């Protein structure tokens, strides 16, 4: 009830009433629910990442792909033949390579298996910035979120505790 709408407002995708103010020098990276569908199916896995990697990241492309379970012949596969989970992992690598300080993730664990969720969670823990994460996946949020914003009855309530504290006190 309003979570994805908030994300769309922050991203400037919809009109809204009121004021929305982002911090100074805020650089946003956005992972939409359909992010994997936006990949170029004709590129290989390696080409998809290599085309956006700049500077120091260029030397780490294969390591980064390996961290997200792409190795060997897999990196030469065309994106169009990848499974939904593989495409989601690839889209997440693209996002993590962008020079951003605010990540907005709208249901990023859809189509992911447990191992991939763990890899993503570790990558997000290592992110040096702010994360706005829309998710119903309590296990994924455990140990990742330190504030919870509850949407309901046309209101947003902030809870300055982790997901377990929020659920316990609800």
Regions found by a protein language model. Name each.
Residues 1-170:
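ABC ATP-binding cassette signature C-motif
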């Amino acid at each position: 009830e309003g979570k994805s709408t908030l994300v769309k407002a922050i991203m400037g995708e919809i009109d809204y009433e009121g004021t929305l103010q982002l911090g100074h020098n805020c650089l946003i990276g956005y992972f939409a629910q359909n992010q994997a569908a936006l990949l170029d199916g004709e590129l290989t896995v390696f080409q998809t990442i290599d085309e956006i990697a700049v500077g120091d990241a260029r030397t780490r492309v294969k390591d980064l792909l390996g961290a997200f379970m792409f190795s060997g012949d897999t990196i030469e596969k065309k994106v169009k033949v990848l499974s939904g989970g593989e495409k989601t992992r690839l889209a997440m690598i693209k996002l993590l390579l962008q020079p951003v300080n605010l990540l907005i993730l709208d249901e990023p664990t859809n189509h992911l298996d447990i191992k991939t969720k763990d890899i993503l969670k570790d990558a997000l823990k290592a992110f040096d910035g702010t994360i706005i994460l829309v998710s119903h996946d309590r296990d994924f949020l455990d140990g990742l979120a330190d504030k919870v914003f509850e949407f309901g009855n046309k209101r947003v309530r902030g809870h300055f505790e982790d997901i377990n504290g929020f659920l316990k006190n609800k």
